[in-house]
Every structure is written in structure tokens, then in C-alpha cells.
Regions:
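Terminal substrate-recognition subdomain of acyl/acetyltransferases
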Residues: 2-3, 143-153
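Conserved GNAT acetyl-CoA-binding A-motif
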Residues: 107-119
Length: 153
């Protein structure tokens, strides 16, 4: 494991056959596991939703530290943060925030992009406060048991 710190440069990189196993090894803390699907499940889901799934590994310098996936529906001009996870060893270092800033810049380049949506399961340990700090606000809508939030771009 490489040494990473708050000063590490965050980048989004393609998931390839060379880094796939490293991405599969990333895990959230046990108490967070019911809030986000595993990276294996996310990548499998992306395979079946190829037309809209855009996913990347989150790197801090040369170390894979997380994963994100976007529902990138340019036809409908709908952009939804589908997955976001940072490995438990690398949480609280600002990597998720930096990765989302990169994602915001990417989504701004997409056709008709005016906002980014996200959803979360409420409860202790949920990412609600994290998303609020990044400017997401509740839409008043639900998707199943998940609360939907939006952030203007």
C-alpha cells in the first residue's frame, strides 16, 4: 500500500483488466456496507446498463482508494451519481470530495447538464451530511426507500 495523505492528488481513472482486482478489494467499513453496493456488483450492473453507466476508479496519487459510477443519460439529460465509495482505510482524507469535484466538472460537459442527482438511504452513518456539505439539497422525491438530492451545476 502506497503512502497517501490529504496532499495526495486525486484522479478518476478507467477500470481496466490491470486494476480490476485492486478495485474489487476496496471495501467500506462494515457499518457502511448496507448503504452502497460492492464494486463487483456495481461493475456487473454497469455491464448490463452500458448505454448509461460511466464508472471510474478513484486514485490518490498511484493508489486506488475508491470507486464511483454515474448514470450518464445524455438522451434524457439526466445525470445521477449512482455509486460512490471510499475504502475504509482512506476515508476522512478528502478524497470523496475531490473525486466529486472532478465529477462535477465532467458532468458540466455533458449535453443539457444542469444538475447532478444522488440518492441515499437515511439512517445512522448515511452520507446525507456529506452530500449537504457539497451543496446537494433534497428534492422532496423518493426512489424506493432512498431520498433524492440534487446539486445545481
Amino acid at each position: 500500500m502506497s503512502q497517501v495523505s490529504r496532499e495526495s492528488k486525486v484522479a478518476l481513472r478507467e477500470v481496466t483488466k490491470e486494476n480490476l482486482r485492486d478495485i474489487f478489494r476496496l471495501e467500506v467499513a462494515p457499518e457502511q456496507s448496507h448503504f452502497v453496493a460492492t464494486n463487483e456488483m456495481s461493475i456487473a450492473q454497469a455491464y448490463f446498463d452500458r448505454e448509461i453507466a460511466w464508472f471510474r476508479a478513484i486514485y490518490a496519487d498511484e493508489t486506488p482508494v475508491g470507486f464511483l459510477m454515474l448514470s450518464d443519460d445524455a438522451k434524457e439529460h439526466r445525470y445521477f451519481l449512482w455509486r460512490l465509495m471510499i475504502d475504509t482505510r482512506y476515508q476522512k482524507l478528502g478524497f470523496a470530495k475531490q473525486a466529486l469535484e472532478i465529477l462535477f466538472d465532467y458532468v458540466r460537459t455533458r449535453p443539457g447538464a444542469k444538475e447532478l442527482l444522488v440518492s441515499y438511504f437515511p439512517g445512522e452513518g448515511s452520507p446525507q451530511g456529506f452530500y449537504e456539505k457539497l451543496g446537494f439539497v433534497p428534492t422532496g422525491e423518493m426512489e424506493g426507500d432512498e431520498i433524492i438530492m440534487r446539486r445545481e451545476l
